[in-house]
């Protein structure tokens, strides 16, 4: 019986801590350069919570499917290049 293709773990070293699978990193890299700033800031804020990372990728995939021909708005989608309320890392003591 033929086996379904498996997801490849990891991406580049700097992306290892953020996304577990290379496909997730590719999706984030593509979409984060094209989404409106408000959506990007919301996703950056959600990425600070490990439990919401899968939800961010799912929303990014849906956005990518709906906006397949979206123009590039920025060179990079990282926190350093896109300061804002979503880029501030929160220190919370429980």
From Swiss-Prot:
Signal peptide: none annotated. The keyword Coiled coil does not apply. Its main location: virion. It is found in: Virion; Host nucleus. It holds the Pfam family Lentiviral_Tat. Keywords: Cell cycle, Host nucleus, Virion. The keyword Cell cycle applies. Seems to function as a Vpr-like protein, since it mediates host cell cycle arrest in G2 phase. Cell cycle arrest creates a favorable environment for maximizing viral expression and production. This is Probable Vpr-like protein. It comes from Ovine maedi visna related virus (strain South Africa) (SA-OMVV).
């Amino acid at each position: 019986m033929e086996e379904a293709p498996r997801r490849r773990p990891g991406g580049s070293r700097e992306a290892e801590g953020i996304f577990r699978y290379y496909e997730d990193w590719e999706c984030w890299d593509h979409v984060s350069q094209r989404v409106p700033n408000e959506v990007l800031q919301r996703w950056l804020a959600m990425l600070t919570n490990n439990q919401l990372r899968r939800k961010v990728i799912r929303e990014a995939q849906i956005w990518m499917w709906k906006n397949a021909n979206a123009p590039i708005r920025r060179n990079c989608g990282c926190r350093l290049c896109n300061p804002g309320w979503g880029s501030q890392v929160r220190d919370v003591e429980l």
